[in-house]
Amino acid sequence: MKRPHDYSSPDSDTDELIDVGQEDSYCPVTGSMSPGSTSQILARKKRRGIIEKRRRDRINHSLSELRRLVPSAFEKQGSSKLEKAEILQMTVDHLKLLHAMGGKGYFDARALAVDYRTLGFRECVGEVVRYLSSLEGVESSDPIGARLVSHLSHCASELDPLLQSPAALPFPPWPWASFPQLQAASPPASSTPFPPNARRDLAPHGTATILGYPSPALRMGSLSTQGTILNPALTSVRQLPSVPGHLHRLQQHSPEGRTVPSSSSSSSNSSPPQISFRPFVPAGSPAGGRRALSSSSKSAQAWGTEIGAF
C-alpha cells in the first residue's frame, strides 16, 4: 500500500515572505515571525519608499531644468506638454548643435545669444502669420501676405547658426541690419517720429521684432535704427490717407476739393520708395494711393473696392 504523496508543505508558503537576515526571528513551530521583525520589515519598506520618492524628485527637477535651458524645449513650454523622452531628445539635439558650432557654445555667450535670437525671430514670424490669418477681408491667397511670409521665412533661414561659420556669427544691434535687401541709404537716427496711423499699420512688422529684445537699451537702439530704415515708407504712408472715409470727408468739407488730392499726389510722386520690401499696408501703399487719387471723382465705396481688389 502506497503512502499518499503530499505535494504541499507547511513551509512552502512562508519561505517567500522571509527576507535575508531574518531567519533567526522565524519560528518553525508556529510558522510566524516575531513582532520585532515585522516592525523592521515595515520600517525598511518605508525607508525604501522615501528613497525612491527622492530619486524621482531629483529626476523631475533635472528634467525641468533641461526644459528651461534648452531653447527648443523652452519654446514649447506653454503650447504643449512635453514628455521626458522628448526633453532628453531635445537636449541631445542641442548638444549636437553646440558641437557643430565648433565647440564654442559651451563657453561663448555670443553663440548662445545668436541661438536665442534665431528662436525669437521665428516666434515673431509665427505671430505675423497668426495676425495675417486673423485679419478680416484678407484672403489666404493674398500675394502681399504670401510675399511677406516667404520673405520672413527666408530671413529666418539666413539666421540659422548651423549655416554659418562659428567665427562669423552676426549679432548686430538691430535684426533687419543683417538683411541686405532691406538696407537703404537714409539720414541719421534723428528722423521724424512715428505717426499714429503708421504705428498702427506697421505694428505686425516693427513691434514683433522690437519685442524680441529683452533689454530696454537694445529696444531703444532698435527704434532709432527702424526710423532710418523705414523712413521712406513712413513718409509715403503719412502723406496718403489711411482710410477711404478720410478722403471723402476732405472733399465734402473743403470748398476746393480738387486741390487736396492734387497736392497729395504730387508729394507722393516726389518721394519715390527707396526700399525693395513693401509693408503689408494695402490702404497706404504708393501704387494703391496713386490709382485711388487719379479717380478722385469716384465715391468712397468705389475707392475701397479698387484698393480691396489690389
Curated annotation (Swiss-Prot):
GO terms for biological process: Notch signaling pathway; regulation of DNA-templated transcription; regulation of neurogenesis. Transcriptional repressor which functions as a downstream effector of Notch signaling. Residues 293-302 have a biased composition (Polar residues). Belongs to the HEY family. It comes from Danio rerio (Zebrafish). Residues 116-152 form the Orange domain. Residues 1-21, 182-208, 248-310 are annotated as: Disordered. Residues 12-21 have a biased composition (Acidic residues). InterPro entries: bHLH_dom (IPR011598), HES_HEY (IPR050370), HLH_DNA-bd_sf (IPR036638), Orange_dom (IPR003650). Signal peptide: none annotated. It is found in: Nucleus. This is Hairy/enhancer-of-split related with YRPW motif-like protein. Pfam families: Hairy_orange, HLH. Gene3D superfamilies: 6.10.250.980, Helix-loop-helix DNA-binding domain. Residues 43-98 form the bHLH domain. One of its GO terms (molecular function) is RNA polymerase II cis-regulatory region sequence-specific DNA binding. Keywords: Developmental protein, DNA-binding, Notch signaling pathway, Nucleus, Repressor, Transcription, Transcription regulation.
